[in-house]
Curated annotation (Swiss-Prot):
Gene Ontology terms: biological process: diaminopimelate biosynthetic process; lysine biosynthetic process via diaminopimelate
Protein family per UniProt: Belongs to the transferase hexapeptide repeat family. DapH subfamily.
CDD domains with a match to the protein in the record: LbH_THP_succinylT
Keyword Amino-acid biosynthesis found: yes
Signal sequence, start to end: none
Name of the featured protein: 2,3,4,5-tetrahydropyridine-2,6-dicarboxylate N-acetyltransferase
Annotated catalysed reactions: (S)-2,3,4,5-tetrahydrodipicolinate + acetyl-CoA + H2O = L-2-acetamido-6-oxoheptanedioate + CoA
Pathway: Amino-acid biosynthesis; L-lysine biosynthesis via DAP pathway; LL-2,6-diaminopimelate from (S)-tetrahydrodipicolinate (acetylase route): step 1/3
SUPFAM superfamilies in UniProt: Trimeric LpxA-like enzymes
Enzyme class, UniProt record, top EC level: transferase
Stored InterPro entries: DapH, DapH_N, Hexapep, Hexapep_transf_CS, Trans_hexapeptide_repeat, Trimer_LpxA-like_sf
Record flagged with keyword Zinc: no
Length: 236
């Protein structure tokens, strides 16, 4: 896990990027060569990729040959790339936004719309449900469930601030907010819609706004919040 100062240095040192994709048509077999952009074109149409400042100059340089173009752009001076997901041993569904320098354990599940910021850690077998947010440095242990729409607050600055820590075997209901610096103890359950402003002891059920202790976890409660390993099964 990166500490706050390492994350700050990573962002500061990173090359800021404004990548674009451009669909072009025209006399493309006559386009000038370029070492700074990638072109995938035939004689009449194609696609080019590169940094906006390079693409902008290239379009101007070749404007007499380009009949029309459409530009796609989704970021400006971005400091943190997306995590390369190809070799992550987890189930990651379309639409999840996961920044670089995130750690994802084996068999984890990241659902559609989840947002995972730099420095976050997700343990083995943990599910991050739809539209949940893990802020910078938020740490979730093994075999947890973070409910849909829940927010684990991030702390990158000030660098001395403590991140959110969710220990192993915790179940967080939907639309829960866990504030900066909070630790949720092993085996605990946080009821849906709660706002957690204080540390949660292990094996405790809490709920409300702000969250308060409702009871210690018993076998009946455990059975209602069972983590199903079948949902974490991978083919490989």
């Amino acid at each position: 896990m990166m500490d706050a100062n390492e994350i700050i240095q990573f962002i500061s040192d990173s090359k800021k990027s404004t990548p674009v994709k451009v669909y072009v048509k025209g006399e493309l077999d006559k386009l000038s060569a370029s070492n700074t952009i990638k072109t995938f074109v035939d004689s009449k149409s194609g696609t080019i990729f590169g940094e906006w400042k390079d693409i902008q100059a290239y379009l101007e340089e070749n404007k007499s040959l380009i009949e029309d173009y459409i530009i796609e752009n989704d970021r400006r001076n971005s400091a943190i790339p997306m995590l390369d997901l190809k070799n992550i041993n987890a189930r990651i569904e379309p639409g999840a936004i996961i920044r670089d320098q995130v750690e994802i354990g084996d068999g984890a599940v990241i659902m559609m719309g989840a947002s995972i910021n730099i420095g976050s850690v997700i343990g083995e077998g943990t599910m991050i449900d739809m539209n949940a947010v893990l802020g910078g440095r938020a740490t979730v242990g093994k075999n947890c469930h973070i409910g849909a729409g829940s927010v684990l607050a991030g702390v990158i600055e000030p660098p001395s601030a403590k991140p959110v820590i969710v220990e192993d075997d915790v179940v967080i209901g939907a639309n829960v907010v866990i504030l900066e610096g909070i630790t949720v103890g092993k085996g605990s359950i946080v009821a849906a819609g709660s706002i957690v402003t204080k540390d949660v002891a292990p094996n405790t059920l809490v709920g409300g706004t702000p969250a308060k202790v409702l009871k210690e976890i018993d076998e009946q409660t455990k059975s209602k919040t069972e983590i199903k390993q079948e949902l974490r099964k991978l083919d490989n």
